[in-house]
């Protein structure tokens, strides 16, 4: 009797080993068949996703400017499913009188940093109004969008705007790279 139990146990454990070995083997084959994206593919994905996020952020800024004439700095996060969620320290339509824009920017950045650190977002946008100078040297209002992506890609887009007959109209824009503040090395690693 004990021999039968031992033999059954050996056969049973052998079957488990064969099944487990097969599963490990299939898993290894799946891992080998996965394509590792090239650096160029990653760069293209980052640019496509940040372009999409920038368009959504500028659309939201225009809507808020048309409705309220101004806005406090706000943020946007791009989730893995393509959804964009906005971060408001001061909700649209609330008074911006007496606010400290630096504190509001810090609150928005902190919220986005937390989302980035936990891996919830792929990209972030920090959006704020800025009074710059046009190419002719005149004062010009602009919407700045600081874009960042999880691979460390970071650029700011400055888009000038004017009040047109049908509301806010974006005119010219420029862009440049900057040091990331959301997807920092602490988040990327």
Q: Which residues are covered by each model-predicted region?
A:
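C-terminal segment of classical bacterial N-terminal signal peptides
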Residues: 16-25
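Low-complexity intrinsically disordered segments
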Residues: 115-189
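N-terminal domain-onset segments
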Residues: 29-107
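Terminal, compositionally biased segments
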Residues: 6-7, 27-29
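Generic secondary-structure transition motif, activating predominantly at the C-termini of alpha-helices
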Residues: 11, 15, 65, 109-112, ...
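Broad gene-expression machinery/nucleic-acid interaction feature
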Residues: 11, 73, 142
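A charged amphipathic helix-loop-strand protein-protein interaction module that recurs
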Residues: 96-126
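Bacterial N-terminal signal peptides that target proteins for export
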Residues: 1-12
């Amino acid at each position: 009797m004990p021999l039968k139990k031992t033999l059954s146990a050996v056969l049973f454990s052998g079957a488990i080993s064969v099944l487990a070995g097969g599963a490990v083997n299939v898993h290894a084959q799946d891992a080998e068949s996965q394509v590792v994206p090239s650096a160029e593919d990653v760069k293209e994905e980052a640019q496509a996703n940040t372009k999409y996020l920038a368009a959504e952020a500028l659309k939201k800024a225009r809507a808020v400017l048309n409705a309220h004439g101004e806005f406090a700095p706000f943020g946007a996060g791009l989730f893995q499913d393509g959804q964009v969620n906005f971060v408001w320290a001061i909700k649209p339509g609330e008074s911006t009188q007496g606010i400290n824009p630096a504190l509001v920017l810090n609150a928005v950045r902190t919220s986005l940093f937390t989302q980035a650190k936990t891996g919830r977002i792929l990209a972030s946008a920090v959006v704020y109004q800025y009074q710059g100078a046009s190419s002719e040297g005149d004062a010009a209002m602009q919407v700045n969008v600081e874009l960042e992506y999880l691979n460390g890609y970071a650029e700011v887009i400055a888009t000038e705007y004017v009040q047109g007959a049908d509301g806010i109209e974006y005119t010219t824009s420029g862009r440049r790279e900057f040091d990331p503040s959301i997807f920092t090395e602490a988040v990327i690693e």
